Amino acid sequence: MFKNYLIISVLILLVSCSDSAYFDPGPCPRAAILKGNETKEMNNSDLVVELNRTIMICEYNLRRKNINFDVGVFGDVINSDTVTLNNLNINIFVAFVGPDDLIIDKWSKSVSVKLKNQKISSFSLPIEGLRSKIEEGRTGSSYKVIIGLE
């Protein structure tokens, strides 16, 4: 009985005195499209660009208190059969949002989407090598990654 009590006491002591520099931030922040399903009509054409869904992978660097992440964006270009373009350039932004909806970092990326001679051309875009700061004591669920069209 005393042996079990001693083991539990030692474990509690170790956990309570552990170094706070190695906090567990938990899962990756949630990546979402700005309006749930963002649509934008392109100037001087019938083209409509639509962002549908995202995927995100992340890695925490706890010593430097930052997060490295990559985002994948999936979408469609609608009415691509009505234009003679082979490629369409679109501008996408990625915002890393912290607690209280404070924007910590924002990036813009101009990407080229290859159009097919179809009513709807689907695309997927990798956005890699993003890095942002995190606060100690905050978990991954305290942050969001918002993606949209500029």
Task: Identify the function of each model-found stretch.
Residues 18-21:
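Bacterial signal peptide processing site
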